[in-house]
């Protein structure tokens, strides 16, 4: 896995030995296996599932034990098997952000290197939209427990 952090964006990539269609499907349809359950905004309530609604206008949300739903991202672009883009509706204080103009974006692109090998490129951008404290978002998602952990778990989910 390679990574780069700049003031405006966090970029990471990983290569997996599967066709691009499979790589895309695992990332979007098995995201609940990729996202650690302890990464949640439900407070003390445990997350029982994380769901990606695989369409533009859909959400990524966590469902808690009581059925409570926390929608923490909006699906902005969904172009199987090439890419998808989501909003990051989480503020610098790690609370839900309700103002779309103060949300950053995460783009995940899937590039076929061969018929059985895919490079997955993740870019978390427009972090400055979060306003004061945006650097804490950048540092948090770039931390080994942020997007690098998600990509590691993604590789494990690929098998």
At which residue positions do the language-model features occur?
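Structured surface interface patches that mediate subunit assembly and partner/cofactor docking
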Residues: 6, 41-44, 125-130, 143-149, ...
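Hydrophobic/aromatic beta-strand elements that line small-molecule binding cavities or substrate pockets
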Residues: 14, 72-77, 103-112
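Hydrophobic pocket/interface hotspot
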Residues: 23-27, 60, 75, 86, ...
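Solvent-exposed alpha-helix faces
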Residues: 28-32, 80, 152
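Glycine-rich portal/gate segments that line the openings of hydrophobic small-molecule binding cavities
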Residues: 45-94
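Beta-strand/loop substructures that line and gate deep hydrophobic ligand-binding cavities in soluble
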Residues: 94-145
